[in-house]
Amino acid sequence: MKKLLFSLLMMIGVQASFAQTLEKMQWFNEPEQWEIKDKSLSMFVTPQSDYWRISHYGFTVDDAPFYYATYGGEFEVKVKVTGDYKARFDQAGLMLRIDHENYIKAGIEFVDGKFNLSTVVTHKTSDWSVITLDKPVPYIWIKAVRRLDAVEIFYSFDDKTYTMMRNAWLQDNIPVKVGFMAACPDGGGFNVKFENFKVKHLPDMRRLEWLKKNA
Protein backbone atom coordinates (compact mmCIF):
# COMPACT_ATOMS: atom_id res chain seq x y z
CA MET A 1 0.00 0.00 0.00
CA LYS A 2 2.84 2.41 0.87
CA LYS A 3 4.56 1.65 -2.44
CA LEU A 4 1.32 2.31 -4.32
CA LEU A 5 0.87 5.63 -2.49
CA PHE A 6 4.44 6.64 -3.28
CA SER A 7 3.96 5.83 -6.98
CA LEU A 8 0.74 7.84 -7.12
CA LEU A 9 2.38 10.84 -5.46
CA MET A 10 5.24 10.68 -7.95
CA MET A 11 2.82 10.68 -10.89
CA ILE A 12 0.77 13.54 -9.48
CA GLY A 13 3.85 15.60 -8.65
CA VAL A 14 5.34 15.26 -12.13
CA GLN A 15 2.13 16.02 -14.00
CA ALA A 16 0.50 18.68 -11.83
CA SER A 17 0.52 22.33 -12.75
CA PHE A 18 -0.98 25.33 -11.03
CA ALA A 19 -4.35 26.34 -12.46
CA GLN A 20 -3.67 30.06 -12.59
CA THR A 21 -5.20 32.50 -15.08
CA LEU A 22 -3.87 36.00 -15.62
CA GLU A 23 -7.20 37.51 -14.60
CA LYS A 24 -6.89 36.02 -11.11
CA MET A 25 -3.46 37.52 -10.44
CA GLN A 26 -3.03 40.81 -8.59
CA TRP A 27 -1.05 44.01 -8.77
CA PHE A 28 1.61 45.49 -6.56
CA ASN A 29 2.22 49.03 -7.83
CA GLU A 30 -0.40 48.86 -10.58
CA PRO A 31 0.57 50.92 -13.67
CA GLU A 32 -1.85 53.40 -15.22
CA GLN A 33 -2.05 51.54 -18.53
CA TRP A 34 -2.33 47.77 -18.84
CA GLU A 35 -4.40 45.15 -20.64
CA ILE A 36 -4.94 41.39 -20.61
CA LYS A 37 -5.70 40.00 -24.06
CA ASP A 38 -5.22 36.61 -25.72
CA LYS A 39 -3.65 35.17 -22.55
CA SER A 40 -0.99 37.88 -22.46
CA LEU A 41 -0.38 40.97 -20.31
CA SER A 42 0.69 44.26 -21.88
CA MET A 43 1.54 47.39 -19.92
CA PHE A 44 3.12 50.81 -20.19
CA VAL A 45 5.76 50.72 -17.49
CA THR A 46 5.55 53.41 -14.82
CA PRO A 47 8.30 56.04 -15.33
CA GLN A 48 10.91 56.52 -12.60
CA SER A 49 10.19 53.14 -10.96
CA ASP A 50 12.43 50.29 -9.83
CA TYR A 51 13.29 47.64 -7.23
CA TRP A 52 16.60 48.08 -5.38
CA ARG A 53 17.89 48.14 -1.81
CA ILE A 54 20.78 50.23 -0.52
CA SER A 55 24.02 48.77 -1.94
CA HIS A 56 26.24 50.77 -4.31
CA TYR A 57 23.67 53.52 -4.99
CA GLY A 58 22.74 54.24 -1.39
CA PHE A 59 18.96 54.37 -1.88
CA THR A 60 15.99 52.00 -1.64
CA VAL A 61 13.10 51.89 -4.13
CA ASP A 62 10.18 49.47 -4.21
CA ASP A 63 7.69 51.04 -6.59
CA ALA A 64 7.78 49.31 -10.01
CA PRO A 65 4.83 47.35 -11.47
CA PHE A 66 4.61 43.71 -10.35
CA TYR A 67 1.73 41.41 -11.40
CA TYR A 68 1.76 38.22 -9.38
CA ALA A 69 0.18 35.18 -7.76
CA THR A 70 1.38 33.42 -4.61
CA TYR A 71 2.80 29.89 -4.69
CA GLY A 72 4.17 27.57 -2.04
CA GLY A 73 6.54 24.65 -2.30
CA GLU A 74 8.76 23.91 -5.27
CA PHE A 75 7.92 24.93 -8.81
CA GLU A 76 9.09 25.95 -12.28
CA VAL A 77 7.90 29.20 -13.84
CA LYS A 78 8.59 30.72 -17.25
CA VAL A 79 7.37 33.58 -19.45
CA LYS A 80 8.10 35.16 -22.83
CA VAL A 81 9.00 38.85 -22.62
CA THR A 82 8.90 41.42 -25.44
CA GLY A 83 9.76 45.04 -24.70
CA ASP A 84 10.31 48.37 -26.45
CA TYR A 85 13.28 49.32 -24.28
CA LYS A 86 14.46 52.90 -24.73
CA ALA A 87 16.16 54.43 -21.70
CA ARG A 88 19.03 53.33 -19.48
CA PHE A 89 18.01 50.57 -17.05
CA ASP A 90 14.66 49.82 -18.77
CA GLN A 91 13.98 46.23 -17.71
CA ALA A 92 11.40 43.44 -17.70
CA GLY A 93 11.21 39.82 -16.60
CA LEU A 94 10.22 37.53 -13.75
CA MET A 95 10.17 38.32 -10.05
CA LEU A 96 10.06 35.96 -7.06
CA ARG A 97 9.33 37.96 -3.93
CA ILE A 98 8.90 37.09 -0.27
CA ASP A 99 8.81 40.69 0.97
CA HIS A 100 10.45 44.08 0.43
CA GLU A 101 13.78 42.82 1.76
CA ASN A 102 13.87 39.42 0.03
CA TYR A 103 13.33 39.02 -3.70
CA ILE A 104 14.86 37.98 -7.01
CA LYS A 105 14.20 39.73 -10.31
CA ALA A 106 15.60 38.48 -13.62
CA GLY A 107 15.15 39.38 -17.26
CA ILE A 108 16.32 41.80 -19.94
CA GLU A 109 17.83 45.16 -18.99
CA PHE A 110 18.87 47.92 -21.39
CA VAL A 111 22.14 49.53 -20.25
CA ASP A 112 24.36 51.93 -22.22
CA GLY A 113 22.76 50.98 -25.52
CA LYS A 114 23.17 47.23 -25.01
CA PHE A 115 20.82 44.43 -24.00
CA ASN A 116 21.82 42.54 -20.88
CA LEU A 117 20.55 39.42 -19.18
CA SER A 118 20.17 40.86 -15.72
CA THR A 119 19.55 39.35 -12.28
CA VAL A 120 19.15 41.23 -9.01
CA VAL A 121 19.14 39.20 -5.79
CA THR A 122 18.07 41.04 -2.66
CA HIS A 123 18.40 39.92 0.96
CA LYS A 124 18.44 43.13 3.02
CA THR A 125 20.69 44.64 0.32
CA SER A 126 20.73 44.10 -3.45
CA ASP A 127 23.37 42.69 -5.76
CA TRP A 128 23.35 42.80 -9.56
CA SER A 129 24.82 40.44 -12.17
CA VAL A 130 24.68 40.87 -15.95
CA ILE A 131 25.46 38.97 -19.14
CA THR A 132 25.82 41.35 -22.09
CA LEU A 133 24.27 40.17 -25.36
CA ASP A 134 26.12 40.63 -28.65
CA LYS A 135 23.05 42.04 -30.41
CA PRO A 136 19.48 43.13 -29.69
CA VAL A 137 16.87 40.40 -29.38
CA PRO A 138 13.17 40.82 -30.23
CA TYR A 139 12.05 38.73 -27.24
CA ILE A 140 13.34 36.31 -24.64
CA TRP A 141 12.08 33.54 -22.38
CA ILE A 142 13.00 33.67 -18.71
CA LYS A 143 12.60 30.59 -16.51
CA ALA A 144 13.05 30.11 -12.76
CA VAL A 145 13.19 26.80 -10.92
CA ARG A 146 12.69 26.86 -7.16
CA ARG A 147 14.12 23.79 -5.39
CA LEU A 148 14.70 23.63 -1.63
CA ASP A 149 16.46 26.88 -0.65
CA ALA A 150 17.73 27.80 -4.13
CA VAL A 151 16.38 29.36 -7.31
CA GLU A 152 17.98 28.64 -10.67
CA ILE A 153 17.42 31.30 -13.35
CA PHE A 154 17.59 30.44 -17.06
CA TYR A 155 17.14 32.27 -20.36
CA SER A 156 16.24 31.10 -23.87
CA PHE A 157 15.81 32.64 -27.29
CA ASP A 158 13.51 29.88 -28.58
CA ASP A 159 11.85 28.21 -25.54
CA LYS A 160 13.81 25.05 -26.36
CA THR A 161 17.42 25.51 -25.27
CA TYR A 162 17.78 27.13 -21.84
CA THR A 163 21.04 28.44 -20.37
CA MET A 164 21.58 29.18 -16.69
CA MET A 165 22.26 32.82 -15.82
CA ARG A 166 22.15 32.64 -12.01
CA ASN A 167 21.80 30.29 -9.03
CA ALA A 168 20.68 32.17 -5.92
CA TRP A 169 19.56 31.47 -2.36
CA LEU A 170 15.93 32.05 -1.39
CA GLN A 171 14.40 30.95 1.89
CA ASP A 172 12.49 27.70 1.53
CA ASN A 173 9.25 26.56 3.18
CA ILE A 174 7.64 29.97 2.77
CA PRO A 175 5.13 31.19 0.15
CA VAL A 176 6.52 33.29 -2.69
CA LYS A 177 4.87 35.92 -4.87
CA VAL A 178 5.65 35.01 -8.48
CA GLY A 179 4.97 37.04 -11.61
CA PHE A 180 5.88 39.75 -14.10
CA MET A 181 8.09 42.69 -13.17
CA ALA A 182 9.00 45.72 -15.27
CA ALA A 183 10.83 48.88 -14.24
CA CYS A 184 11.93 52.18 -15.76
CA PRO A 185 14.34 53.90 -13.34
CA ASP A 186 15.61 56.65 -15.65
CA GLY A 187 13.18 57.02 -18.54
CA GLY A 188 9.65 58.08 -19.37
CA GLY A 189 8.20 54.59 -19.53
CA PHE A 190 7.99 51.94 -22.25
CA ASN A 191 5.70 49.21 -23.55
CA VAL A 192 6.22 45.57 -22.60
CA LYS A 193 4.32 42.34 -23.21
CA PHE A 194 4.34 39.10 -21.20
CA GLU A 195 2.96 35.91 -22.73
CA ASN A 196 3.07 32.10 -22.50
CA PHE A 197 3.17 32.29 -18.71
CA LYS A 198 3.36 28.84 -17.11
CA VAL A 199 3.88 27.63 -13.57
CA LYS A 200 4.48 23.91 -13.00
CA HIS A 201 4.42 22.27 -9.59
CA LEU A 202 7.48 20.19 -8.69
CA PRO A 203 7.29 17.46 -6.02
CA ASP A 204 9.12 18.29 -2.81
CA MET A 205 12.48 16.52 -2.96
CA ARG A 206 12.76 15.90 0.78
CA ARG A 207 9.27 14.43 1.01
CA LEU A 208 9.94 12.13 -1.94
CA GLU A 209 13.15 10.95 -0.32
CA TRP A 210 11.29 10.22 2.93
CA LEU A 211 8.55 8.32 1.10
CA LYS A 212 11.16 6.33 -0.78
CA LYS A 213 12.89 5.30 2.44
CA ASN A 214 9.61 4.51 4.19
CA ALA A 215 7.73 2.81 1.35
Predicted regions and their residues:
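Extracellular glycan-recognition regions
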Residues: 20-215
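Bacterial Sec-dependent N-terminal signal peptides
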Residues: 1-21
